[in-house]
């Protein structure tokens, strides 16, 4: 009982303290200037609402008198608006007013901490402090020296009692284009006025953190489900973070986290805010999308690109198509796609290589087609080196409801991606602290970034408003992608990147050859995922799991390996090369120049395909071999790999023989009954034949010693097989 009696006064004191704190917070008002609702302003409001700040915005709907908005040089308009707003608060002695910019400011903590730090400053007015003097460097000598901290006044944020702030701005009679910072600086540098109003600077960034001149000092601090900006130089946790001018990009980075928009405990807490759901909307009511396709250089797997475009789960009748093809190499592929599928789209516009339109001009044309059409709701720009493997990609991007958004795309096995997390001082790539985590999926969310490329979705309304008078793809001497991002940033439009889903990947174009008939066959090293999709049978993984492997003869295994495209292109490549052997024993292509069991064939090394074929054997045949012949390990070495051609009037069959291999792979490249009649393989020791080889299926059997075999006669048409003597 005595303990309870002792605790009662303590509880009463805590209750009184809480009431006093609440009363104190009620006497705090945040004033800011925002002439229009930009994305930066909405971010500011969201962080303020998170901490329950009371905000009053000044100047909404008013024209800004200086180009560049409220954060630009000038700023006298802000003083005028503040002076007028303070008229009704001038006699409120208990009212504390925080005045901050809004487009480039976020709150990192709440009113209680703000007011506590303000009271500890023991001043009537506290200004933010900066590393550099601005705008008049001649005034530097007049500034009081400080033993530790930032020396110079910053006008982007200050806090004070209402009567003192009224005195501060009472003398303002300048123009809207005059400098607010110079006005406040001259008052501060006047010792009499500084003492009369009782003005101090937040030298150690306890309240205000100006990022300009302090980028190396500020890091993110993750703590108990919250995120703060920490100043390493002074070991302080600022309440207000301000990133004006060139430091806006760093503020965008910090704003991805502060105050609790992404944490390690919660992940992204705001990714589902403001979504535009497309569920339940009929096809005819879906937004109209203009898809801009850009083929700017020789690109592998263009057929797959168009196939993935067709697979998008979005009605073609709500899509318009604009294609810029700069490459004659792809002219027939583009025309074939449009001939087969162009009528499925609402409209089609093609600019081919004969027009010779520059990359940037073509991209501007695509954006203009949407900008100038009020019915165009979205512009979806996609480069041909994008492998868009998620069929719901377009819907997912639309639902995220951002002005500009890109899906994360990376190159296979590399950190190369379609976004930059930061920019260097000269505007080029710089790796942000979170770049690798975002690329590798350890941090998942929707990220405000300074650079995107290759694929992005833009709202038509943004093209007709914030971006309406912008030559989007020209900027100084920059490439079109960097020009686009620089222009968008300049218009204060945020560019977002989402890695909430696996959308696809980027192709590597570095080593793409155009000297063959079917150049994609050579891409097994550079673009292995796409090579597999195009050339490896869809049921190969089932075969690897043992579900689709047949045994037509003892120790002879039969399983799917190649797609129709792989078979057809390999045959066409060989016929295009055309230098078939004569089918006699003399053969200068092999060591010794003598072939004991000759065929009419072309070796893989004759078409410079030996290295790629070995990669195929290692990646797809070796795993099957090791599964089917337990205890055997192979690196799939070979001396001979070739395509054989059988014709009734040329070489219809092959005599009984042993192969010079530990095991042999024999892949049927065309279809019995359609392309030829007869054919097959007979294993004499077992009196067992495979008479109807399936196109794209491989026969795998031991070579020397046990499996003595012959090629059965082809009686009509032409039969092709791909043969490899592995581990000779």
UniProtKB/Swiss-Prot annotation:
Fe cation binds at residues 657, 659, 709. It comes from the Eukaryota. Highly expressed in the liver, heart, lung, skeletal muscle and kidney. PROSITE patterns: FE2OG_OXY (PS51471), LYS_HYDROXYLASE (PS01325). Keywords: Dioxygenase, Endoplasmic reticulum, Glycoprotein, Iron, Membrane, Metal-binding, Oxidoreductase, Signal, Vitamin C. The keyword Oxidoreductase applies. Its main location: endoplasmic reticulum. One of its GO terms (molecular function) is iron ion binding. It is a peripheral membrane protein. It is found in: Rough endoplasmic reticulum membrane. It catalyses: L-lysyl-[collagen] + 2-oxoglutarate + O2 = (5R)-5-hydroxy-L-lysyl-[collagen] + succinate + CO2. Residues 1-18 form the signal peptide. Its EC number is 1.14.11.4. Glycans are attached at residues 198, 539, 687. One of its GO terms (biological process) is response to hypoxia. SMART domains: P4Hc. InterPro entries: Collagen_mod_GT25, IPNS-like_FE2OG_OXY, Nucleotide-diphossugar_trans, Oxoglu/Fe-dep_dioxygenase_dom, Pro_4_hyd_alph, Procol_lys_dOase. The active site is at 719. GO terms for cellular component: catalytic complex; collagen-containing extracellular matrix; rough endoplasmic reticulum membrane. Residues 637-728 form the Fe2OG dioxygenase domain. Its cofactor is Fe(2+); L-ascorbate. Coiled coil: none annotated. Homodimer. Identified in a complex with P3H3 and P3H4. Part of a complex composed of PLOD1, P3H3 and P3H4 that catalyzes hydroxylation of lysine residues in collagen alpha chains and is required for normal assembly and cross-linkling of collagen fibrils. Forms hydroxylysine residues in -Xaa-Lys-Gly- sequences in collagens. These hydroxylysines serve as sites of attachment for carbohydrate units and are essential for the stability of the intermolecular collagen cross-links. This is Procollagen-lysine,2-oxoglutarate 5-dioxygenase 1. The lineage of its organism: Eukaryota, Metazoa, Chordata, Craniata, Vertebrata.
